[in-house]
């Protein structure tokens, strides 16, 4: 028995339907499209999601939610990642250089995930409550920049 001699089980591989290649093929003349009608000619293509007249799925399901055009997107930094890096002062520029964030978007937010054991100074637009607590407990400072006034 060779690898080159192995064949798939009988009936597993279906032969390709060669459409419009003569009457002897069984799929010549109208090429399985029937005679006349909207779908018989060239250029026919069904719309995406068309289900033969049945109410399509995207219309059967209810509308839900909306896109908030005022949503702000923040670049997120966790305290655990700051802990692993050398240095005691982290500004937005240093975070960009170190690769902690790729882009500032609408600001930088520091979250409290991770353990902080040393004193650090962090500069960001927003801080979570847990991040503020952990920074202050470690004896560090959190400087909020560009605080919006309403």
Swiss-Prot record:
InterPro entries: Ribosomal_uL15, Ribosomal_uL15/eL18, Ribosomal_uL15/eL18_sf, Ribosomal_uL15_bac-type, Ribosomal_uL15_CS. Disulfide bonds: none annotated. Pfam families: Ribosomal_L27A. GO terms for molecular function: rRNA binding; structural constituent of ribosome. One of its GO terms (cellular component) is cytosolic large ribosomal subunit. Keywords: Ribonucleoprotein, Ribosomal protein, RNA-binding, rRNA-binding. One of its GO terms (biological process) is translation. Residues 1-58 are annotated as: Disordered. Belongs to the universal ribosomal protein uL15 family. Binds to the 23S rRNA. Part of the 50S ribosomal subunit. This is Large ribosomal subunit protein uL15. It comes from Solibacter usitatus (strain Ellin6076).
């Amino acid at each position: 028995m060779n690898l080159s001699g192995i064949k798939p089980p009988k009936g597993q591989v279906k032969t390709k339907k060669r459409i419009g290649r003569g009457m002897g093929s069984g799929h010549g003349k109208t090429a399985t499209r029937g005679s006349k009608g909207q779908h018989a000619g060239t250029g026919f293509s069904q719309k995406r999601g068309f289900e033969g007249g049945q109410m399509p799925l995207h219309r059967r399901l209810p509308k839900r939610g909306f896109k908030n055009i005022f949503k702000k997107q923040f670049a997120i930094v966790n305290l655990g990642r700051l802990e692993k890096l050398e240095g005691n002062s982290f500004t937005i520029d240093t975070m960009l250089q170190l690769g902690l964030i790729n882009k500032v978007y609408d600001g930088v937010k520091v979250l409290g995930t991770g353990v902080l054991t040393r004193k650090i100074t962090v500069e960001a637009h927003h801080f979570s409550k847990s991040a503020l607590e952990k920074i202050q407990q470690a004896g560090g400072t959190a400087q909020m920049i560009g605080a919006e006034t309403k």
